[in-house]
Each structure stands twice: as C-alpha cells, then as structure tokens.
C-alpha cells in the first residue's frame, strides 16, 4: 500500500459510500467523456470505471500511483500530468471530478475555469472553508468566488469529516457541484482575472479611489458590497471604455 505524500497534499478517501455519493453527483451518461483529477488509490475511480461512458481519463501527477492505476484501469486513458496545466482543448462537454489536494486546489480550479467552454459539469471535494467561500455572497467573498461564479452555478452538496480520510486531515472537507452556465460573457479571461484580483485587493477602499470613470452609483461602494452582476457590469463597461481602468496599481 502506497503512503500518502505530503508534497502532493494527498489525503486518500477511504469511505466507499461517500465515494459512490460523490460520483453519483456527476450524473455520468453513456456519451460522456469523464476526467478524474488526482485519482489517488481509486476511491472514485472504482465507481466511475463501472459506469457506461464514452471515455474515462485519469490525470495523476504522482508517478508511483500512476503506475498502479495504469495496471488496474487498462480501459482508461491515463495522463501523468499536473492538473493545473492540463490542456482540455481537444475535448467538449467534459464532466470533471476529483478530490482536489488542499495545497493545489486554486491552481487546478483556475485552469478548469480558464477552459470552461470545454466543460459541462464538475464535482470537486475541497476544504470546507474554501468551498464555503466559493458559494458565499457575504463580505468574505473573494476574487476566485467572482471568477468561478461568472461561468458556473455552484452548489454545496455535503460535508465530509476528516475521519473518512487517510491520513486524517485537521480540517473538514466538502463536495461542490459546478454546473456550467448557459450564457457566459466573452471576457478575455486573463484580463478579467487581473481585474478581479485588483478589485479584491485593498477591499475596504471605495471604488472611486480605485477605478477611473466609475459610475456615480458605484463610486462610494466597496468591492465587498457588489453583487456578481455589478462586478461583471463594471468590468465590461470600463474595459470597453478605457484600458487604464485603475487609478493606480494596487498590490495583488
């Protein structure tokens, strides 16, 4: 039995019931191409492998685990790659699932959102605190909340206590479902991300002190007071009106 590696942030799910429940959330159909990120010892893979589908792709960075998966799941496509860099451009209507490593979740999630046009649905297990910040509309929301919710409807499925993992983490996990929105903006994603990061830095600043040509109705507001629709509207309006959106360059 392979031991979890701290360098990869590995915590292996050991409950078959929970694994089955997570896989069922993905709603796999016969014509679906499914990608699993970080299969580990195969808790989710076992159930995915049994389902009728077009193709199952396993993305695993750990070479030791990759070798075991290659022997066990011969009818799956295996990629020994970093999920934060994997290219999805040759696929469409992907369904993606995974227990994301606590120390790599952000880079993986960003890579998936960057390629959202190739994705129809995602189901991810994350640290509970992280998951809650992705679905909140409170003052605790972040730039990643805005970025993810621009392209996906996200809902909280259930929590998973640490005792169901090996080794036992100090935090509780949760499962989120990301359903691709039908109408998404055609923003240039890197520019939009940069805008969001700057907007959410110095978050107590009023917008009139951060943005050039901001409309009066937003001037005295802070980013934490804005809805997602407000944020998208401001970006779309200012990026079309003036490339020099910010009054200065706030630290990221």
From Swiss-Prot:
Keyword Magnesium in annotation: no
Highest rank taxon of the organism: Bacteria
Reaction catalysis annotation: adenosine(1518)/adenosine(1519) in 16S rRNA + 4 S-adenosyl-L-methionine = N(6)-dimethyladenosine(1518)/N(6)-dimethyladenosine(1519) in 16S rRNA + 4 S-adenosyl-L-homocysteine + 4 H(+)
Pfam families per record: RrnaAD
Residues engaged in binding S-adenosyl-L-methionine: 11, 13, 38, 60, 82, 99
Gene3D superfamilies named in the record: Ribosomal RNA adenine dimethylase-like, domain 2 (1.10.8.100), Vaccinia Virus protein VP39 (3.40.50.150)
Keyword Transferase assigned: yes
Annotated SUPFAM superfamilies: S-adenosyl-L-methionine-dependent methyltransferases
Sorted UniProt keywords: Cytoplasm, Methyltransferase, RNA-binding, rRNA processing, S-adenosyl-L-methionine, Transferase
Signal peptide interval: none
Primary localization: cytoplasm
SMART domains registered for this protein in UniProt: rADc
Subcellular location per the Swiss-Prot or TrEMBL entry: Cytoplasm
GO molecular function, one term: 16S rRNA (adenine(1518)-N(6)/adenine(1519)-N(6))-dimethyltransferase activity
Cellular component GO terms, alphabetical: cytosol
InterPro entries on file: KsgA/Erm (IPR001737), rRNA_Ade_diMease-like_C (IPR023165), rRNA_Ade_Mease_Trfase_CS (IPR020596), rRNA_Ade_methylase_Trfase_N (IPR020598), rRNA_adenine_dimethylase (IPR011530), SAM-dependent_MTases_sf (IPR029063)
EC number(s) per entry: 2.1.1.182
Family: Belongs to the class I-like SAM-binding methyltransferase superfamily. rRNA adenine N(6)-methyltransferase family. RsmA subfamily.
Main function: Specifically dimethylates two adjacent adenosines (A1518 and A1519) in the loop of a conserved hairpin near the 3'-end of 16S rRNA in the 30S particle. May play a critical role in biogenesis of 30S subunits.
UniProt name for this protein: Ribosomal RNA small subunit methyltransferase A
Gene designation: rsmA
